[in-house]
Structures are given as C-alpha cells and as structure tokens.
Amino acid sequence: MALIFFSALAVAFSGAMMPGPLLTYTIRQSLNAGPYSGFVIIAGHAVLELLLIVLIFMGFDIILQSDSAQSVIGIVGGLLLIYMGADMVINSLKNKVKIELDNKKSKPGNMLFSGFIISAANPYFLLWWAVIGLGFLIQAYKLFGSAGVLIFFTGHILADFIWYGSVSLIVGTTRKFIKVNLYRVIIAFLGGVLIFFGGTFFYNA
C-alpha cells in the first residue's frame, strides 16, 4: 500500500506544480482572501476528484474520452475562464481591485465552489482522470480493492493540498508588503493568464 500511496503522491505533485488555471486562481484568491484560501479551493477540487473516481468506476470514463465531450468541455470551460480573466483585467484597469479582504468573494463556500468549477472546466484535467488516472485506479483496485483506491486518492489529494496550500500560505502572508499599484498589475497579469488558458481550451475544442 505504501507504494500506491507514494506513487500517487509523486504523480500528483508532477501535475499540481504545472501552471494552470487553478494555480492562477489560487494565487489571486490568496492575495485577496489570505493565506488559507488554497486549502479551501483544493477542497472543492478534491470533491470533484472523488466524484470523478466514483463515475469512472461506473463507466463514465468512456464519455469523458469521447471527442464530443472534450469539445463541449473545452468550449464551455474556455469561455468561463476567458470571462473570469477578462473580469480581473477590466477591474484592474478601472482601479476596482484592492488588497483589503473582500468578504463576498472570500466566503469559503464561494472558493470551494470555484475550486470545483475551475477544475471541471479544464478538459485536460478530466481527460487525465479518464485515461491516466483510470490506469492507476485499476492497479490499486486489483491489488487492494476499495482500500487501494482510497489509498491512491489520499496520496493524490495530499499532494494537491501540500502544493496549493504552500503557495497560498506564501502569497497570502506576504501580500501586506505589496503596494496597491503592483497588486493591480499582478491581478491584471493573472487575468491575462486565465484568458490564455481559456483561449487555449476553446481553440483546441
């Protein structure tokens, strides 16, 4: 079981540390809501992953691998990320962003939901689970049954919590040293990154 756990941990780290829309959103919320935002966001991400594991064992992976599903996810997800990114850029240009805590956007429920939705909007994330993740799950299930799957999921999601939590803690605790103008530039840049990912998803759909 230790091999399954550490394999899941290593594989998840390799994916979590790659730049993507979820990391971009985590940095943005850490600046806005504080050092613990990443943990809440990844909790939403974890709920989606747990749901995907259940659906995959029900045969849903076939649907996720289909061209039509990938196209729909890419188009809808791409448009969602473009909208979020554009909103960040526009608010930065209009000087509507501020470092102070935004209670509405910082509610745990909102960040939890966003972690779920942003992950679901990423067609590459869903395809990874439908292909690569499925292979690991099958091996874990063959060796140790449901316990093996649980061990794999635990190792996988622990890596996400460690990485995104660390990023959130670092960004959230240093935000007080960031000047307002620099903060607006950072938010605009992060918005541009989301637009880039959204455009990529949409184009590849």
Which residues make up each language-model segment?
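Hydrophobic/aromatic residues within the transmembrane alpha-helices of Major Facilitator Superfamily
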Residues: F13, M17, A86, A120-P123, ...
